[in-house]
Amino acid sequence: MRSPSAAPIRHDLVLVGGGHAHIQVLKRWAMASVAGARLTLVVDRPVAVYSGMVPGFVAGQYSRDDLEIDLRPLALRAGARCIVAPAIGLDTGTRRLVLDGRPPIAYDTVSFDVGSTVAGLELPGVREHAIPTRPIGEFVRRVDEILAVARARDAARLVVAGAGAGGVEVAFALAARLRGERRGHGEVLLLESGPRVLPGYAASAAARVLAAAAARGIVIRTGARVTRVETGAVHLEGGERLPADGVVWVAGAAALPLFDGAGLETDGGGFVRIRPTLQCLGHDEVFAVGDCAAWTAGPGLAKAGVYAVRQGPVLTHNLMARIGGGHLRSYRPQRDFLSLLNLGDGGAIGTKWSVSVEGRAVFALKDWIDRRFVRRFQVLDREGAITPDFAAAPMPGGDMLCGGCAAKVGESSLTRALERLGVPSHPAVVLGLAQPDDAAAVETERGEIVAATVDSFRAFADDPYLVGRVAAVNAVSDLWAKGVTPRFALAQVSVPEAEPARAEETLYQVMAGARAALEADGVTLVGGHTTTGLELVVGFAVWGFAASADTLIRIGGAAPGDQLILTKPLGTGVILQADMRARARGEWVEAATATMLRSNAAAARAMVPLRPSAATDVTGFGLAGHLGEMLRTSKASGVLHLAALPALPGAVALLGRGIRSTAHPENARARRAMLVEPDAARHASLDLLFDPQTSGGLLVAVPRERGPALLSALRAAGDEAAAVIGEVAPPRPDGALIRVVATG
């Protein structure tokens, strides 16, 4: 997250896509950024796939960990914002990048490294019955579908449409995988619409492919143009129907619709035209590299990853030079490049100029090149440990305080301050300081019960739209926990000091996110207040109406025998802290983000008809703190089962590595009122009890006989992680509020 002491932002550089060139920009930026420039990475998913290793993955030579690059920690190492949202358009007039599902973002300079899609998807049945190899990340996720088809039949026929380099490698990879799984009766059929395989490659390389295919039982047909795909078959031009149990579509590159209507000059295929500096023609502020770009300073370049790799250093220099006022360099593509085709079984074909070679040594070279390249950008391993290549590099985050609900005053400090203050009284107060709860409630002179709450926190990410959404979801949660439907809200936003246009953009993004969340819950934003300060702080006052004082679900009604049900998984605190340090995998942060964005509205609607004894929402004080308050107010004790706690992916692993939210030590004071059994003291999930939650779930005490019905209703409503985590018990003679056991 951007430090409040950082230089004022004067230039917004936005990278769209996590391709082979942009990852080089990120790594270089981590070593030497440009003062006053804010770097933003926009991707549709937080993981990039190295395309050169995908055939090896299909063949079973690599795991996903071998070929995936986690973009989020790489971006955070560079001090960049990371926004996960598909880019769907560009407005060059206003310099806005159009995103799917959220407002456009502003740029001063924008660079595209978004690749391409597969040609021919518009043909009948292709989208429905074939698996395209682009987007490459989606193809990797669907490889198991292809293999499942082959495994389900003794003599499955897999058809690969397109015999360029990609199609050849996929066909050989599938054949090798079938042989490796002893499914030798399966058949791989490679179809090419043109007169020969490997169009554009040396004839000697094509001859080697034909010979290697014959030796491995791969059938190749040229002059076979597919016109339609249906369940169980492909149709060729001329009317021939070929049986096919599975179809992989590798029929060349096509442009993405991203640049349609953007006012950028494109070639006949829709690829954006660039000059040697990698800038788009007529728009110096727009750069493009890799497959999405069309080269204009000479013969067109093949759609091959090697060009994006070689463009990376030039792009990095030119982006920095444009911001800093330096001289831009020209990219000079090589006249030919070494192409290495994986045959899937330990061999490979290499070709450059008109020469081709084949053998295990060729694959060994390819494997060494590919693994070395990917390792340069892998910040974390599968378990979240820092990889050797990044172990010595400076860590972002430092001693920065956590944002979100971890930025609250600790429970003990809050309690002592209120005790010193004293409790004012008024006959209209139904819930107030005399009976602390998640929300306040007062009775009007007309007998209406108005429930209200206020909540705010420091930004937990450099994404004001996301912060606004989460802050709104978090604020209304207090009312949902009381069984009250929120109706109206006021905003309180402190925007970091900046030039007027950037301050306006920050405020707009915050309020757009907040409004999206509030309106989804039926809440109308009716006003608010803004200030400027050192950092972004977002809060809301929210109120609604209860039918009567008796319908309020209070925190203090839990009774012995009640089941304790938690509706959301735990771990947002440690994941957000790890994210500040670039120590959290992108998929972990995405899971945490999804749970923070999930409103407790559905859970409340499932809860209210089943008449719970008590409820609260789990936020900054952690599960132990909020449960302790429930039990203390209810004059009861409770039993928690650590094995039953739902946890976000990565949370327990990060806690095991010693990472803690800055609020964790204060929350851990709750252990003084706990009896932790010896088996629980050694349990990996113990520290989850003290992890501060941002926009956490509801903690519900419900009579045991209604517990199963509530759990079923919660899961049916979308709270799939909801779980029974313990039970309420009578007060203990030793005074302990919570007894913690490992298992039930």
Give the role of each language-model region.
Residues 2-10, 79-161, 248:
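FAD-binding core/adjacent interface of flavoenzyme oxidoreductases
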Residues 77, 82-89, 93-94, 105, ...:
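A Rossmann-like FAD-binding core segment of flavoenzymes
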Residues 391-744:
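Helix-biased detector of long, well-ordered alpha-helical tracts
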Residues 128-154, 232-235, 241-310:
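FAD-site-proximal beta/loop scaffold in flavoenzymes
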Residues 2-81, 160, 168-201:
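Beta1-alpha1 glycine-rich phosphate/pyrophosphate-binding loop at the start
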Residues 113-114, 237, 250-251, 289-292, ...:
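Short, well-ordered coil/turn residues at beta-beta hairpins
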Residues 2-3, 9, 345-393:
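C-terminal auxiliary extensions adjacent to catalytic cores
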